[in-house]
Amino acid sequence: MQFMGTASRMASTQRAKPMEMPRISRDTARMLVNYLTYQAVCVIRDQLAETNPAGAYRLQVFSAEFSFQDGEAYLAALLNHDRELGLRVMTVREHLAEHILDYLPEMTIAQIQEANINHRRALLERLTGLGAEPSLPETEVSDRPSDSATPDDASNASHAD
């Protein structure tokens, strides 16, 4: 019974404190905006590769010089470099956000839950030794009589002496 209390206390201390939630939410939103900026650039680059290969190359070269770690700084630099392309990235990024964000919460929770189950299963298998059957060395397998041996095989083996 004491173990359950200890586990319960550990779980409650591992949860984020309510005052941390706004900061975590802001950081997550910022990271998602940066990622959607990156995805918008990828979509546009792929479109340009089909219609304007030189434009796709220029976007690729520009993107190699600027980090997507800060999507807003990337976008500001792109707007200074090529206003039309910057506006296009903003439009595509907004479109992606409008269409993906509805599904994101439940997809994220489902993927995290599934991944956690798989990690826990692998850990349990590793701790209990149930994950992998130990394989027998080849010499042991060849020294044992086969279950599929026929009576003729047994009589042939005894006459070989």
Swiss-Prot record:
Q: Which HAMAP family match?
A: RbcX
Q: Domain text from the record?
A: The homodimer has 2 functional domains, a central cleft essential for production of soluble RbcL in which the RbcL peptide binds, and a polar surface which plays a role in correct RbcL subunit arrangement.
Q: Which GO terms describe its cellular component?
A: carboxysome; cytoplasm
Region (Disordered) residue spans: 1-20, 130-161
Q: Where is the composition biased (Polar residues)?
A: 147-161
What biological function has been recorded for the protein in this entry?
An RbcL-specific chaperone. The central cleft of the RbcX homodimer (RbcX2) binds the C-terminus of an RbcL monomer, stabilizing the C-terminus and probably preventing its reassociation with chaperonin GroEL-ES. At the same time the peripheral region of RbcX2 binds a second RbcL monomer, bridging the RbcL homodimers in the correct orientation. The RbcX2(2)-bound RbcL dimers then assemble into the RbcL8 core (RbcL8-(RbcX2)8). RbcS binding triggers the release of RbcX2.
Q: What does the record note on quaternary structure?
A: Homodimer. Interacts with the exposed C-terminal peptide of endogenous RbcL ('Lys-460-Asp-470') via its central cleft, as well as C-terminal peptides from other cyanobacterial RbcL. Contacts a second RbcL monomer via its peripheral polar surface.
Q: Where in or outside the cell is it found?
A: Carboxysome; Cytoplasm
Q: Mention one GO biological process in which this protein takes part, according to its record.
A: carbon fixation
Q: Does the keyword Nucleotide-binding apply?
A: no
Keywords recorded for this protein, A-Z:
Bacterial microcompartment, Carbon dioxide fixation, Carboxysome, Chaperone, Cytoplasm, Photosynthesis
Q: Name one GO molecular function term.
A: protein folding chaperone
Listed Pfam families: RbcX
User: Would you tell me the protein name for this molecule?
Assistant: RuBisCO chaperone RbcX
Member of which family?
Answer: Belongs to the RbcX family.
- InterPro entries cross-referenced by the UniProt entry: Chaperonin_RbcX_sf, Chaperonin_RcbX, RbcX
